[in-house]
């Protein structure tokens, strides 16, 4: 695959990670900068690009509101600051995007929400629904409960996981550096900027350093970990200096960044991931369902004739035809017990059978490899 440097303005789905040092300074929220960023977000949406924002800053804002001292905080202090700051952060984004007629939603997640299969499917479905409704999700770590994330500052990696979860083709990490260098440019005058990284080698990983800012906790090492996750999921990732006003416009107009290139597209990477999973059960379907799967449609309960194995929601299963031939593999949206109960029934009968509303498809086409 030829290495083609991505163009930010051509993204179909863009995830933008905003570091604390960009959003918050000693005086509080950088309101003018945030308004300019949201101007860029509105312009991107007008071009037809879905946008998801992964924003740090809740703890930094909360500690200012609470008057907590400078320096490291105890875990319970960080959690308290996050609880206060999350409200302020969500309101700030809502107010900055409202003049553009853009609705926002707050999603508080942890890395577990994107790595556990059941929670992954729920997160993906929620995000897809929000984006389909024209909403800009504002994602942050749930720092009020996620003590490990507070200690290690994983918002860079969280952004990469979110990008993979929602099938983004581009991830932009806005930070206080303009990309990856061969050494720390603030201490080594011979350091060279790398505009494109085609493969994350041990030599590239060795270029990671420690955080420079006193506000942001994410250093280059976490950004390289994020890049590895993103490109494995088919998502191109860029590291850009974001302190300027209208940072997305600046990147689109050629500002210096480092792009990390994937070797596949998001959908192909996702299909490969699903195909590699060991199935926990089998679902046998009739001829009509088999034909529908061949046409790229989702698997509905009505076409299911048998369910074997024991599996939970989000687990991988294999789909077989009436003769035992393999048709597809995918992530199932119901447990084996639920699947047996609704097998052969129409989707509009699910609530009456299970006692609660469910999803129309047993396996959605986006979660299936035929």
Swiss-Prot record:
Primary gene name: proB
Location in the cell: Cytoplasm
Binding positions for ATP per the UniProt entry: 17, 175-176
Record Pfam families: AA_kinase (PF00696), PUA (PF01472)
CDD domains to which the protein is assigned, alphabetical: AAK_G5K_ProB, PUA_G5K
Domain of life the protein comes from: Bacteria
Record protein name field: Glutamate 5-kinase
Domain PUA: start-end pairs: 280-357
InterPro entries: AceGlu_kinase-like_sf, Asp/Glu/Uridylate_kinase, G5K_ProB, Glu/AcGlu_kinase, Glu_5kinase, Glu_5kinase/COase_Synthase, Glutamate_5-kinase_CS, PUA
Catalysed reactions, semicolon-separated: L-glutamate + ATP = L-glutamyl 5-phosphate + ADP
Main location: cytoplasm
A GO cellular component entry from the record: cytosol
The organism's taxonomic lineage, starting at the top: Bacteria, Pseudomonadati, Pseudomonadota, Alphaproteobacteria, Rhodobacterales
NCBIfam families: proB
Pathway in which the depicted protein is active: Amino-acid biosynthesis; L-proline biosynthesis; L-glutamate 5-semialdehyde from L-glutamate: step 1/2
Gene3D superfamilies, per the entry: Acetylglutamate kinase-like (3.40.1160.10), PUA domain (2.30.130.10)
Family, per entry: Belongs to the glutamate 5-kinase family.
């Amino acid at each position: 695959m030829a290495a083609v440097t991505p163009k930010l303005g051509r993204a179909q789905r863009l995830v933008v990670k905003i570091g604390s040092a960009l959003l918050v300074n000693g005086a509080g929220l950088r309101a003018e900068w945030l308004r300019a960023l949201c101007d860029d977000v509105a312009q991107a949406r007008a071009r037809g690009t879905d946008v998801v924002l992964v924003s740090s800053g809740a703890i930094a804002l909360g500690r200012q509101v609470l008057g907590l001292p400078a320096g490291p905080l105890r875990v319970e202090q960080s959690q308290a600051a996050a609880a206060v700051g999350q409200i302020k952060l969500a309101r700030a984004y809502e107010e900055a995007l409202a003049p553009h007629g853009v609705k926002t939603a707050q999603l508080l997640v942890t890395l577990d929400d994107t790595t556990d299969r059941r929670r992954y499917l729920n997160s993906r479905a929620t995000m897809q629904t929000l984006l389909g409704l024209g909403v800009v999700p504002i994602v942050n770590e749930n720092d009020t409960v996620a003590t490990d994330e507070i200690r290690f500052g994983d918002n860079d990696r969280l952004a990469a996981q979110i990008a993979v979860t929602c099938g983004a083709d581009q991830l932009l990490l806005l930070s206080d550096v303009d990309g990856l260098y061969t050494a720390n440019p603030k201490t080594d005058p011979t350091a060279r900027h790398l505009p494109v990284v085609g493969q994350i080698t041990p030599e590239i990983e060795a270029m990671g350093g420690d955080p420079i800012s006193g506000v942001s906790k994410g250093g280059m090492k976490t950004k390289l970990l994020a890049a590895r996750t993103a490109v494995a999921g088919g998502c191109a990732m860029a590291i850009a200096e974001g302190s300027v006003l209208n940072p997305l416009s600046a990147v689109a107009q050629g500002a210096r960044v480092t792009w990390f290139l994937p070797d596949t597209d998001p959908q192909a990477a996702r299909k490969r991931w699903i195909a590699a999973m060991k199935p926990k059960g089998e679902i046998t379907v009739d001829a009509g369902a088999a034909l529908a799967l061949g046409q790229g449609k989702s698997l509905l309960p009505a076409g299911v004739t048998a369910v074997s194995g024991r599996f939970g929601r989000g687990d991988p299963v294999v789909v077989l035809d009436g003769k035992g031939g393999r048709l597809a593999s995918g992530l199932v949206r119901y447990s084996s017990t639920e699947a047996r109960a609704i097998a052969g029934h129409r989707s509009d009968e699910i609530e009456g059978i299970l006692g609660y509303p469910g999803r129309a498809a047993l396996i959605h086409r986006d979660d299936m490899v035929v």
